[in-house]
Amino acid sequence: MKMYRIRKDDKVMVIAGKDAGKIGKVLKILRKKDRVLVEKTNMVKRHMRPNPYAQQPGGIVEKEMPIHVSNVMVVCSACGKATRVGYKTIESEGKEKKVRFCKKCNEVME
């Protein structure tokens, strides 16, 4: 399984594409397709047929579409900048724990 430096509920900035510069929260990670679903970005309109069995009205619906994971960067909660993420081990109570940290300000991101 692939390891991503982005996790669900992370605050990320889109760095490429039509929504470049927008900041949003990661709603879902699609590991098989290397994509993430970011809140309020890459919005598209879909024409939905009414479905009376599911009580779904028809019409034009706006929804988010996935963005490739290489086109987003994590926004650090400490410095507020889009940054790369690194990993380091921290020893606490005799146990070593692997944590993510901001490469710009070296603050732990958890």
Swiss-Prot record:
Provide the alphabetized UniProt keywords: Ribonucleoprotein, Ribosomal protein, RNA-binding, rRNA-binding
Name the Pfam families for this protein.
KOW, ribosomal_L24
Task: Provide the GO biological process annotations.
Answer: translation
Q: Which GO terms describe its molecular function?
A: rRNA binding; structural constituent of ribosome
Q: Does the keyword rRNA-binding apply?
A: yes
Question: By its UniProt entry, which CDD domains does this protein fall under?
Answer: KOW_RPL26
Task: Tell me which GO cellular component terms the UniProt record holds.
Answer: ribonucleoprotein complex; ribosome
SMART domains named among the record's database cross-references:
KOW
Q: What InterPro entries is this protein classified in?
A: KOW (IPR005824), Rib_uL2_dom2 (IPR014722), Ribosomal_uL24 (IPR003256), Ribosomal_uL24_CS (IPR005825), Ribosomal_uL24_KOW (IPR041988), Translation_prot_SH3-like_sf (IPR008991)
Spell out the subunit comment: Part of the 50S ribosomal subunit.
Q: What role does it play?
A: One of two assembly initiator proteins, it binds directly to the 5'-end of the 23S rRNA, where it nucleates assembly of the 50S subunit. One of the proteins that surrounds the polypeptide exit tunnel on the outside of the subunit.
Q: Which family does it belong to?
A: Belongs to the universal ribosomal protein uL24 family.
PANTHER family found in the cross-reference section: MITOCHONDRIAL RIBOSOMAL PROTEIN L24 (PTHR12903)
Name assigned to this protein: Large ribosomal subunit protein uL24
Species per Swiss-Prot/TrEMBL record:
Desulfovibrio desulfuricans (strain ATCC 27774 / DSM 6949 / MB)
